[in-house]
């Protein structure tokens, strides 16, 4: 099978790279290895939330924050990709979201500040409309609503924590729980269960009535925060309909996995690529690459019990990171799955981790060292293959978790890698 460019990955970087190639008139193939951690970590596109991992002061304007970060850290992936790639990539993504039927908002000119499921403020750049009413730059009181039998969102915890960091004379956060109509007491729900139930108009209407009764407010100046379960496939209709029924602003809050918001985002974008003519190869992880005369001539996929070779003029490795299984971790070393080079070696395996879950983890910085064109670098300091380009979390030397920059880096490097692949 021969293509212009083969994109390997299952996340936002892979999707942005594929879309960029498609819009440039190329014939890409998207090799989707399988379920990735993006279903668990993505709900918004976070470009740059904090300028360093230890500060609690959010970045107000992502464009300005990234420009300053590039000036201070010229070897950062944002610097390699370039501010122009971030700007153009975000423009590409926002236009694509609209074309694919999403209702999102945001820009590089400002960050929203949104409450998490635990009630901590979190800066985000691009968000679904269904989350916008939760912006903590507004002062209206918040009522967090949970559901009996659904344990992935604890409204009392969210209200307590948010009160400490955000509450004040004109701000308040409280919590309620309601029983869901049509179910026996003791029933346990998942996010998917609830998302499907909320697509029923009658169910929505009765839930809205119960929330009004439990909240004991007339709706004037109050907003309601719910776990993100307002529809699985028809969310653009469910959220505004439910908000009308309730008579108050409603916002969704991302919860524990599986993330309904992420399922909506990635499944719909992936489907849109297929509907517009992009070939997608499913559940076929790449396990080897053939290099001749400094160029990759083909990659090999594990597909349905057989080896499947893919040939292309260029390749974009838009893998995620060690959490997604993009790298092969042994006791003492971590290898990449294509060229089988050692990316990291630890005499003591525990050096890869920090005992504290809330501190930066060394393993998160493992990945490909790249050139200024995002080509993977070998042990000799030269590109392993001149027509291979890396995007996303597989680039070495940074951990986006603390700075809330995973989405921005995926967009910038995915877009830049696609442009380099076109020129290869």
What are these regions (language model features)?
Residues 3-30, 418:
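N-terminal Rossmann-like FAD-binding beta1-loop-alpha1 element of flavoenzymes
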Residues 6-8, 31, 286, 309-320:
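Short hydrophobic core segments
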Residues 19, 325-332, 385-386, 393-424:
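A conserved FAD-binding loop/helix module that cradles the flavin
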Residues 23-43:
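Glycine-rich FAD pyrophosphate-binding loop
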Residues 34, 304-305, 312-314, 318-325, ...:
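Glycine-/small-residue-rich beta->alpha transition segments that form the dinucleotide
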Residues 43-84:
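Glycine-rich active-site loop/strand segments that organize a redox cofactor
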Residues 153-166, 201-220, 224, 230-289, ...:
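Helical element adjacent to the flavin cofactor pocket in flavoenzyme catalytic cores
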Residues 270, 289-309, 315:
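Conserved beta-strand-loop-beta-strand element in the redox core of flavoprotein oxidoreductases
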């Amino acid at each position: 099978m021969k293509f212009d460019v083969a994109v390997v990955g299952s996340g936002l970087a892979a999707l942005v790279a594929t879309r960029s190639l498609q819009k440039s008139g190329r014939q890409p193939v998207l090799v989707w290895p399988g379920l990735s951690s993006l279903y668990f970590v993505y709900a918004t596109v976070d470009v740059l939330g904090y300028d360093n991992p230890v500060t609690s002061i959010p970045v107000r304007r992502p464009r300005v924050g990234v420009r300053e970060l590039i000036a201070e850290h010229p070897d950062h992936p944002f610097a390699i990709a370039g501010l122009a790639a971030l700007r153009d990539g975000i423009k590409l993504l926002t236009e694509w979201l609209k074309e694919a039927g999403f209702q999102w908002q945001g820009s590089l000119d400002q960050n929203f500040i949104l409450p998490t499921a635990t009630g901590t403020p979190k800066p985000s750049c691009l968000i679904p409309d269904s989350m916008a009413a939760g912006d903590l730059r507004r002062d209206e009181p918040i009522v967090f609503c949970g559901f009996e039998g659904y344990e992935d969102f604890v409204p009392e915890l969210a209200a307590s924590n948010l009160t400490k960091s955000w509450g004040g004379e004109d701000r308040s956060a409280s919590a309620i729980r309601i029983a869901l109509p049509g179910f026996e007491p003791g029933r346990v729900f998942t996010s998917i269960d609830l998302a499907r139930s909320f697509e029923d108009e009658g169910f929505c209407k009765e839930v809205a009535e119960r929330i009004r009764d439990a909240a004991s407010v007339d709706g004037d100046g109050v907003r309601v925060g719910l776990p993100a379960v307002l529809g699985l496939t028809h969310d653009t209709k469910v959220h505004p309909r439910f908000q009308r029924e309730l008579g108050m602003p409603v916002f969704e809050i991302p919860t524990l996995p599986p993330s309904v918001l992420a399922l909506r985002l990635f499944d719909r974008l992936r489907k849109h690529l297929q509907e517009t003519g992009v070939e997608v190869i499913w559940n076929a992880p790449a396990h080897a690459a053939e290099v001749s005369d400094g160029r990759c001539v083909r990659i090999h996929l594990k597909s349905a019990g057989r080896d499947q070779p893919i040939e292309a003029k260029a390749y974009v490795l838009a893998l995620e990171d060690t959490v997604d299984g993009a790298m092969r971790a042994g006791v003492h070393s971590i290898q990449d799955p294509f060229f089988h080079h050692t990316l990291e070696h630890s005499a003591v395996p525990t050096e890869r981790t920090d005992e504290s879950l809330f501190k930066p983890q060394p393993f998160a910085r493992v990945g490909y060292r790249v050139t200024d064109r995002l080509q993977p670098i070998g042990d000799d300091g030269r590109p392993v293959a001149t027509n291979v380009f890396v995007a996303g979390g597989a680039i070495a030397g940074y951990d986006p978790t603390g700075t809330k920059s995973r989405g921005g880096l995926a967009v910038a490097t995915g877009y830049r890698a696609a442009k380099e692949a076109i020129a290869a």
